[in-house]
Amino acid sequence: MAIISSVRLWTAQDALTSSGTIGTALRLTVPILLAGMAGLWAERCGVLNIGIEGMMIFGTWAGAWGAWQFGPWVGLLFAILGGMFGGLVHAVATVRFNIDQVISGVVINLFAFFGVRYLSELVYVGKKGGGISQSPPQKWALPKFNLPILSGGEIAGWKSPDFLGWLELQRWFILGDLGGIGRGLTHSISWATVIAVVVVPVSTWVLWRTRFGLRLRSSGESPVAAESLGVNVIRLRYYGLLISGGLAGLAGGTLSIVASSYYRQGQTAGRGFIGLATMIFGNWRPSGIMTGAMLFGYAEGVKLVASDSITASFLFIAAISVMFFIYAIIRRKRMQVLIALVAFCLSAIAYRTVDTVPESLTQSLPYVVTLIVLATANQRLRPPAMAGVPFRPGEPH
């Protein structure tokens, strides 16, 4: 926090930690977080889910249709059901018929893209505001709220003070940044965001603290041993993929219902694959996935709200690289020392020589961050041992 606050003061780029940037980043984090959690549930039960992108597409279309017909809450339910349909197709293909899991995921992505386009032609063409590539707008927006006292929310009709907003306006060292970040996280919050955040601790508790979670993880670590102990691996993989599909569908629903008010072709924009990157970055752990999703969401938020601040972010990266360089030397990690040194040199040169960032590079920032994170991810990654390996019950292994 001290580093980013120093960078903000040095470069006079208040947008780096403004409530607008953080609020936008939070909204953009939600679908990536849910996509990452969808990948977690699938791979923890032993099945690769490359089809998250397609399940999100099902969710965007079904959610927008439900919101158009019945309102946003029903729309979110339809989004979950749409994603679960994709999860069920993937389960039948990979668990029942042992089709290659990567091929099945790719086919689901293609089927979703062309399938919803066909449905749009049947349902939306000729309707007011609709067409082959978009749906009519939803009936009303999903409710949002502000936290009382902190961000000006109401208590029994009384409008409370906006303490964090006041603190942000002071722009004091560290405190002003905390005010901007805090207000961005507590002002104009959608209930869909709350649901997405709750998914993280609930998934952690279910997967690591319940009998069901233990059995599901065992089907991804050692299905043969699990079967010998009486665990129904096939059934658990169906459950895992249905949950995975539901979360992916909900991720798509937040795009067409919360981030927008209608379905639009190409709305997912590769977020399903970025979600898979957050899963790897997070080492197949919910807390790590949330950290990765926040990183990608912030990168996209800066791109949309504070594109003029991207050059200032080079200085922030350089400062972080110095700290990472010192840490790597202390831990005697040669590869990480080299990575930190290269990152420092590139970011320092970019900060000193680049005045404006080309629009094409600005638009690709989230994907550049994805590549950097995957290239520098912890080498001690431990995926589920049998994720992606076909399993046939009752056969000798």
List where the protein language model places each region.
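Helix-loop-helix "hairpin" substructures at the membrane interface of multi-pass membrane proteins
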Residues: 184-262, 286-287, 291
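Single transmembrane alpha-helix segments in multi-pass membrane proteins
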Residues: 20-76, 80-106, 276-289, 376
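Helix-loop-helix hairpins and the membrane-proximal interhelical loops
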Residues: 1-33, 37-41, 45, 387-397
